Structure formats: structure tokens, C-alpha cells
Amino acid sequence: MSHQSIDKEFKKPNNHQKIIPDEKTPNTKQEKREAYKLLKNKKPKDKKITYQSKMNNPEIHRYDYI
């Protein structure tokens, strides 16, 4: 048994490496500014404050840092 056949068996398909066409690298100043705005506007979903989380952790939310 050669090494090549083993590699072929255990290699995963490259389906997960999909190229996203709409996320191109910004070239002009305007495009860079737009990309920066998009990055600033993206908020992490897990930082959402609910009433429940405020009641559970009053210390964290005392000064509303989030």
C-alpha cells in the first residue's frame, strides 16, 4: 500500500472552503471607509443585554460598559 492511496482515502473534500465573491479587498479610499463602517457596525450577538442577564449579573452592567 503506497502513501498516496492512504492520502486519497483520508483527505477531506474542499467543500467548506467556499470563496465569497462579495467580500473583496477594498482598493480605493471610499471602499476602505465603507468596509471599516461595516466592521464597526457588526456587533457580537452574545453581548446582547437582556433583562434576565442584568438581574443575574448586576455588577457587570452597573456602569453599562457593554
Swiss-Prot record:
Residues 1-66 are annotated as: Disordered. This is Putative uncharacterized protein DDB_G0293150. Residues 1-12, 19-37 have a biased composition (Basic and acidic residues).
